[in-house]
């Protein structure tokens, strides 16, 4: 499979995951918690394709929502990697570059490969 095809498949899958909150017990509530935290600058998107905490979190519900979303993304990246003969890490990075970064709203944070949080 070509890199372009892999990117297209991964982009569609990640987009669906971001919209549905796949594998979450209460996707709407978890997505709402994470979206609010992203708006406040508490949670951001990392270069590896996972959510991360820009600021230390004390809210157990938010921590659980981030962990659940990241678990869903990890499963997606493993599946995409197996189908496309790449590592899950490469799939996560590709998802960030092709889908996640483009969906960041102004004011939201993302983490660079060097580890710095940057406000969009």
Residue positions per predicted region:
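Short, well-ordered alpha-helical segments
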Residues: 66-81
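N-terminal signal peptide c-region/cleavage motif recognized by signal peptidases
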Residues: 19-22
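Amphipathic, charged alpha-helical segments and their helix-to-coil junctions
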Residues: 27-64, 83-84, 88-120
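Short amphipathic alpha-helical segments, especially helix-boundary/capping motifs
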Residues: 10, 52-55, 69-72
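Bacterial N-terminal signal peptides that target proteins for export
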Residues: 1-10
């Amino acid at each position: 499979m070509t890199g372009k095809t892999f990117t297209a498949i991964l982009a569609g899958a990640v987009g669906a995951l971001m919209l549905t909150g796949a594998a979450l017990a209460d996707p709407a509530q978890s997505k709402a918690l994470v979206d609010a935290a992203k708006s406040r600058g508490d949670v951001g998107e990392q270069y590896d394709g996972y959510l991360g905490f820009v600021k230390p979190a004390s809210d157990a519900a938010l921590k659980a929502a981030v962990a659940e979303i990241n678990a869903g993304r990890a499963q997606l990246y493993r599946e995409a990697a197996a189908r496309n003969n790449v590592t899950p890490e490469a799939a996560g990075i590709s998802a960030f570059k092709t889908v996640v970064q483009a969906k960041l709203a102004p004011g939201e944070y993302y983490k660079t490969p060097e580890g710095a949080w940057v406000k969009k």
